[in-house]
From Swiss-Prot:
Domain called bZIP: residue spans: 30-62
Gene behind this protein: radR
GO molecular function annotations of the record: DNA binding; DNA-binding transcription factor activity
InterPro entries reported in the protein's UniProt record: bZIP (IPR004827), bZIP_sf (IPR046347), Sec_Metab_Biosynth_Reg (IPR052635)
Residue ranges of coiled coil: none
Species per Swiss-Prot/TrEMBL record: Floropilus chiversii
Highest taxon listed in the record's lineage: Eukaryota
Location of region: Leucine-zipper: 51-58
Biased composition (Polar residues): 1-30, 170-181
Keywords: DNA-binding, Nucleus, Transcription, Transcription regulation
Subcellular locations according to the entry: Nucleus
Family as reported in the entry's similarity comment: Belongs to the bZIP family.
Name of the protein in question: Transcription factor radR
Chain segments carrying region Basic motif: 33-50
């Protein structure tokens, strides 16, 4: 039985690549998307085959039950005369109604394993639990309760009018009455001190026989019969009870398929990144770019771990990420890197303009005092320090640009960068004579070749 269970549990998992056709062998392709499509196609085909086989099995069971019910109907017609004899016997035995102690009934003739499905249900005082036979057709056919209460409570013996649908009771030569069910061996009860109340009930389908309630009374206590307990009723095997829920199979198939394609740390970079992109879309992000944007731009709770990671990443990891991306962009096509370069230039423009707007007034007043107060190298150093403190980003940019076009005759290009900044900021807002004196201070004298020699 455990081997069967293990086989059944694994029957809904993704089939091995050795069991599929060459067209469905996902190990022969390197494309992750194509591999996933092949695996999903194989899993769906396997699931449909399992459902189709299960439906055929259920249809066969229903046909067997219908055939058995038709045969049982023919047997009931033959036993109609025997039912009449049993009714006469029960009516003449009315004196037993006053007895309160049930008579012990021998279980020697009872079958230990009644066949399924039974057409006779014993009442609750005959055994402590209601006998219920689980089967695959229970969902389609549920028996209704008896149409009328028995005459047991009114002190009368009653035999239901549908005696043809109950079990046959016939006297035997040994003084015992035989109850002949349609399934299983006969059951013998003593002829003395016997009262039976048979109640017919209707089922929802012709595949089930009419149920009857059997009440036995006598002068001795009635023990619990092994054949009447739930433990001895034939029930579906564990394998059949766990096998056939289509929704359950769908869930296991989808889960196992997703688990089978879950990439690990040894998987290729393409598979891992594709998995991350899919998970980001599943949790509500439009794409991976929106996830990264939200991580760096949103404001999280100050004491959360996410906020701490965000602050560290902004200061340490994000600059390296931008540098690596810009370095890798040199290998992109012109169309791919065009948009990024434009955004970099726009961002630099916004940064430098906002920096210069805030420092313009302070620079103009300080530089006017320096120009009017004197000249010389000392004044140039003062102007350079002032510019570095007020507009550091523009100073770094202009110095880098000037150093990239340096002349072998002039090693220090800071004066050129400083003069360019003065022209950029104060051309048109400062008097021309004052601006020329400022440029003379900023630009150093060129070194002649004779002096170098």
């Amino acid at each position: 039985m455990p081997n069967n269970l293990q086989h059944q549990e694994g029957s809904y998992s993704l089939r091995s690549s050795n069991d599929v056709s060459p067209a469905d062998d996902w190990t022969q392709t390197n494309d992750p998307k194509e591999k996933k499509r092949i695996q999903n196609r194989v899993a769906q085909r396997t699931y449909r085959n399992r459902i189709r086989a299960r439906l055929e099995e259920l249809e066969n069971k229903i046909r067997c039950h219908e055939k058995a019910s038709k045969q049982d109907g023919n047997e009931n017609e033959d036993r109609a005369s025997e039912k009449a004899m049993a009714q006469d016997f029960l009516i003449t035995d009315q004196a037993l109604q006053s007895l309160t102690l049930p008579r012990r009934v021998s279980s020697a003739g009872l079958s230990q394993e009644p066949a399924t499905p039974p057409d006779l249900l014993l009442p609750s005082f005959f055994h402590q639990q209601q006998v219920k036979i689980p089967s695959a057709a229970d969902e389609l056919n549920q028996p209704k309760p008896p149409s009328s209460p028995p005459a047991w409570a009114e002190g009368q013996l009653n035999v239901a009018p549908r005696a043809a649908q109950a079990r046959s009771i016939a006297p035997t030569s040994t003084g015992m009455h035989q109850i002949s069910p349609s399934y299983g061996p006969p059951v013998f009860l003593p002829t003395e001190d016997l009262s039976i109340d048979i109640i017919s009930s209707r089922g929802l389908s012709s595949s089930w026989k009419t149920a009857a309630d059997l009440t036995v009374q006598g002068t001795h206590p009635l023990p619990a019969f092994p054949s009447c307990s739930l433990a001895n009723i034939e029930s579906p095997s564990p394998a059949s009870s766990q096998a056939t829920d289509p929704m359950d199979m769908t869930f296991h198939t989808a889960t196992e398929a997703n688990t089978a394609i879950l990439p690990g740390h040894r998987s290729s970079l393409d598979e891992r990144l594709e998995y991350v992109l899919e998970r980001a879309e599943q949790v509500g992000f439009d794409n991976f770019d929106s996830l990264v944007t939200a991580y760096y731009s949103e404001t999280f709770h100050g004491s959360s771990r996410l906020a701490s990671e965000q602050r560290l990443s902004r200061n340490r990891r994000l600059p390296r990420v931008i540098a690596e991306i810009f370095r890798a962009a040199s290998h992109w096509s012109a169309w791919e890197r065009g948009g990024m370069n434009q955004e970099v230039i726009k961002s630099a423009e916004c940064l430098l303009i906002s920096e210069g707007t805030a420092a313009r007034n302070a620079l103009e007043g300080s530089l006017s005092l320096l120009v009017d107060g004197g000249n010389g190298s000392g004044d140039a150093s003062s102007v350079e320090r002032l510019v570095q403190n007020e507009i550091p980003n523009l100073w770094a940019l202009m110095t880098s640009l000037a150093s990239g076009t340096h002349s072998p005759r002039q090693q220090d290009r800071s004066g050129t960068a400083l003069a360019a900044i003065m022209l950029l900021y104060f051309s048109g807002s400062m008097p021309k004579e004052q601006l020329l004196r400022l440029l003379i201070i900023c630009l150093p004298d060129p070194v002649s070749p004779q002096k170098n020699n």
